């Protein structure tokens, strides 16, 4: 196999560049590295039995246990905490074949991802899965040294870390409190809306009844006015009838007096009058001197008779008028009793109306107070809802930023993983090419050696 000089030069140049960067890393590692006994003592201090011999000949399970303790201390992450997420990922990827990836391996891979992030924060940027499964002494010294130094630095900055952690916890508690208050305010707002709807129906019913009572009151007022007018007319008619009755009674008394005066004349019979007339006519001759007086008396009697007839007719008319007046008086008394009952009913209705008006005013004041309270609560709830909404928007923005950062980190991790795989592939190809060159160089060396031996043999023969 021929020797490739170009590949050899490229390999040497890459080796020189790698040696330069490795030299800087070695200087940093030299500053950060701790003695084996100090590392073992620190691990023993955390409660895990560990010796320098365990560091020289590492056990993967023991190393994983120590790293898991550091991860739990610094990130609150263990294989148990990543198990649900890894199980869900396995269910999504493997589907009906969950046994393709064993549970321990799956959890260890999830733990490795978190551990690699921690190691990157500690300064170990070349942490690989092999450091968990096949650790070496040099790698463990570097990893544990960086971890212990990071823990020491963290302990020296405990006050600042606790301050930021307390701020974070307070922020979380404040968010939870605001969310709870927002939920409570929403429930109270819904309850107030339901109460407002119920009160609106009741108030509408009260207003409707109030309007009905007002219309009824107006009708009663108009009826009262009509009854008052009728009562005034009846009173005027009563006064007129009383005056008329008084006049009729006075006329009746005068008529009765005149009748009493004329009664002696009326009680005499016609026969006696005829006899008297005969006697008068017989004595006419004897009493010629009394003829004029008798004629006057006869005319007076005729006048009295006509007057009696007229008075009798007037008495009959007065009796009939008295009967009509009695009927009218009875009607008037009935009207007065009805008017008094209507007046009492009107006064009672007026009292009811006043009570209704007072109740309405009270309900209006209560409604106004409730409306003010509801408006104040609504404004307060609206302000708190706006504040909560703004806070939720801020939290959403923070969440979006965190998601973007997480996505970017995942993409970066994926790019790094691809880059690492490509680098490993290049290294494998380069290793293969180097081995091929070494093999070809070895073959060339063997050929040259055989040629030289042959040449020496020939030279010896020729000598």
UniProtKB/Swiss-Prot annotation:
Biased composition (Basic and acidic residues): 337-354
Ranges annotated as biased composition (Polar residues): 1-18
Pfam families with a match to the protein in the record: Nuf2, Nuf2_DHR10-like
Claim: Cell division is one of the keywords in the record: yes
UniProt keywords, alphabetically: Cell cycle, Cell division, Centromere, Chromosome, Coiled coil, Kinetochore, Mitosis, Nucleus
Residue ranges of coiled coil: 166-455
Gene Ontology annotations of biological process type: attachment of mitotic spindle microtubules to kinetochore; cell division; kinetochore organization; meiotic chromosome segregation; mitotic spindle organization
GO terms for cellular component: Ndc80 complex; nucleus
GO molecular function, one term: protein-containing complex binding
Subcellular location: Nucleus; Chromosome, Centromere, Kinetochore
Chain residue ranges for the region called Disordered: 1-27, 331-354
Family per record: Belongs to the NUF2 family.
Subunit note: Component of the NDC80 complex, which consists of ndc80, nuf2, spc24 and spc25.
UniProt function note: Acts as a component of the essential kinetochore-associated NDC80 complex, which is required for chromosome segregation and spindle checkpoint activity.
Protein name: Probable kinetochore protein nuf2
Organism: Emericella nidulans (strain FGSC A4 / ATCC 38163 / CBS 112.46 / NRRL 194 / M139) (Aspergillus nidulans)
